[in-house]
Amino acid sequence: MADWLLLIPWNKIFTAACGCFFSDRNYIHKMEANLDDLHTTMEELKNGRDDLLRRVSIEEDKGLQQLAQVKGWISRVEIVESRFKDLLEDKSTETGRLCLFGFCSENCISSYNYGEKVMKNLEEVKELLSKKHFEVVAHKIPVPKVEEKNIHTTVGLYAMVEMAWKSLMNDEIRTLCLHGMGGVGKTTLLACINNKFVELESEFDVVIWVVVSKDFQLEGIQDQILGRLRLDKEWERETENKKASLINNNLKRKKFVLLLDDLWSEVDLNKIGVPPPTRENGAKIVFTKRSKEVSKYMKADMQIKVSCLSPDEAWELFRITVDDVILSSHEDIPALARIVAAKCHGLPLALIVIGEAMACKETIQEWHHAINVLNSPAGHKFPGMEERILLVLKFSYDSLKNGEIKLCFLYCSLFPEDFEIEKEKLIEYWICEGYINPNRYEDGGTNQGYDIIGLLVRAHLLIECELTTKVKMHYVIREMALWINSDFGKQQETICVKSGAHVRMIPNDINWEIVRQVSLISTQIEKISCSSKCSNLSTLLLPYNKLVNISVGFFLFMPKLVVLDLSTNMSLIELPEEISNLCSLQYLNLSSTGIKSLPGGMKKLRKLIYLNLEFSYKLESLVGISATLPNLQVLKLFYSNVCVDDILMEELQHMDHLKILTVTIDDAMILERIQGIDRLASSIRGLCLTNMSAPRVVLSTTALGGLQQLAILSCNISEIKMDWKSKERREVSPMEIHPSTSTSSPGFKQLSSVNIMKLVGPRDLSWLLFAQNLKSLHVGFSPEIEEIINKEKGSSITKEIAFGKLESLVIYKLPELKEICWNYRTLPNSRYFDVKDCPKLPEDIANFPMHAEE
């Protein structure tokens, strides 16, 4: 019994009892009054908190950050409010225990403890109320130096990132341009560069990322910069000039990095307010774009081309995207997957989109179907192709300056996949189609064509080939062009492109009444027997086939046909007379065919301005051509079986509209005479000397100023001399002139290709130094040639490195050749080099590197 009494907390009972009657705080007696007071003050506190939260929200909308003391006060209010709710739950129980008019309780200890909590909560609420007045509730957020970007994958980008980063960290590089075709990974590369600045936070004050977009406004760029700098939101209502001033005042005190993603045209950084990057301020600017054009205006210190992935890198990205689980679901799928990946030609965007589409395909039938779709003219129908690839790439097309340039670009899609298109041939097509100026003078259509090709290459819509005389299209860009050309897939029947497919005969699925352009290049077609009404057909491309015969009725109903290309059909020996029905025809290419004569019906082709008969190895005569085709502007007879004689030369003089001419000549006297007829000589672009025997041949650099191609085949010529002063007509050997010091700068400035085969007589070809811009040189089967360039003669002509612009050099079957050129061991621009069967040529010369850096 005594032990039980000892367990009673007599001290608390005593304290509580005293508190009931004698304590100043009267926790029990004042319980109800304190609860009422707590309820009132708590409501006031919550209202104060809500008012403060509204103020904080307004300031945060301005880009400011809540003060820590404000955040702490609000947090304390939340805690007090939670305690208040707990007290309210026990209120009825505790107030129900009160007795003796509230001076005592049925459970004094419980009531005492509860009353104490009420009092302390009330005191804390009153304390918080006394501190609720804040003059300032938020402050400016410290600007993070780098905002890290999320990156999907960096497969194949490591080397490019390292190269770009190394270049950017060079003190001499203040502005860096990353250019490449759409979808190639420029934004990902820029994001990698952005994230690398995390490692250099101490060296730069701020890294700013701006998305420029195609239809950018200066204010839009300014707003992104100001937002990144966390300046007060009052700037939103400011003028463009005021915003520029705010940006300039902020950045001129900082070592900043500006990353501009996706530039489409020149951006005036001065108008935006961005200080120019200098060595003094340490600033850097990097921008990405699809065309090299902008980098010129933005004054980039360095340009880096972002190229497509290598085959191995492309496969790795595709494999990761598809996932190994799918690839291992059937033993044949990996091989099929590699075929699908190869169709993307290393374009990361295509690899990711097509890879994601195939990531759920577990059967070989699905993979075979994917390959069939990608190989078909309806490749744009592949899942995700239109909305995620073609629409992205279309921005590059939309940025082209005008409709004519867009038409020129779309025309390139008529050629087979990976087909290398001759620039000159492409321009001829464009001119005859009417896309560009038909004027063929020095400042006319041809130059305009090269300008357009350059623009398309810089926009990464065309790719310059290894030999710069050719261009080609990336597979996905070609798909985009075909998609646009068919009105975004809505009118596929208006364009028929089956180039590269082995169809052997004209496809039956061509809707001849609707189709506008038909391209059946390299399709192995052997004969054409159909005869359909082709009311809208304007372009018919049939080169690189095996045509033997064209039916009589084929050309009967093609009133709008403008371009007809039958070239490189070696077995085609005649054309039907019904070709006379092609009343709109302007372009006819019969090069590399077995045509023996032109049909009489051609005299009705009054609009024909272009006729190509080059490499026509069976052509017998062109008698009467001036009367038959009086409006010809271009006549090409390079490597033709028809050589210029007095009769043909007379005919050519009567062709008043002739502006471009290529010829084959086998008589030195004819060569001399034609050079004396200024109008004919100045129009010659290609000259083939064949089966010619003469003690010497004189070439006038003035008369033949437009010469671009020269071939010397099976000739016995002891000496080739230059005539470089047209008025004095003085013949000179190479040793008599030094073009680098001559005021008249003699030489064949346009000559880019020379082919010499079976030349007997000369021991050297030093006169080639007069072709300062030579790009391609082929020399073979010439038994007496000992040097390409003789040291004594060459040094008298120029002190510069020979063949500085040469891209292709092929030398073979020259048994006496001992030296190529005395003053070089590199070809700075060489892309193709081959030496064979030249036993006396020193091995170190025969195997010298193509590029100086090698």
Swiss-Prot record:
Molecular function GO labels: ADP binding; ATP binding
Swiss-Prot/TrEMBL GO biological process terms: defense response
Record domain NB-ARC: where: 138-441
Keyword ATP-binding in record: yes
Binding site for ATP: 180-187
Keywords: ATP-binding, Coiled coil, Leucine-rich repeat, Nucleotide-binding, Plant defense, Repeat
Coiled-coil intervals: 25-62
The UniProt record lists the keyword Nucleotide-binding: yes
Ranges of the LRR repeats in the UniProt entry: 514-535, 536-557, 560-582, 584-605, 607-629, 631-652
Protein family membership: Belongs to the disease resistance NB-LRR family.
Stated role: Probable disease resistance protein.
Free-text comment about domains: The LRR repeats probably act as specificity determinant of pathogen recognition.
PANTHER family: NB-ARC DOMAIN-CONTAINING PROTEIN (PTHR33463:SF220), NB-ARC DOMAIN-CONTAINING PROTEIN-RELATED (PTHR33463)
Name used for this protein in its record: Probable disease resistance protein At1g51480
Species of provenance: Arabidopsis thaliana
Top-level taxonomy: Eukaryota, Viridiplantae, Streptophyta, Embryophyta, Tracheophyta
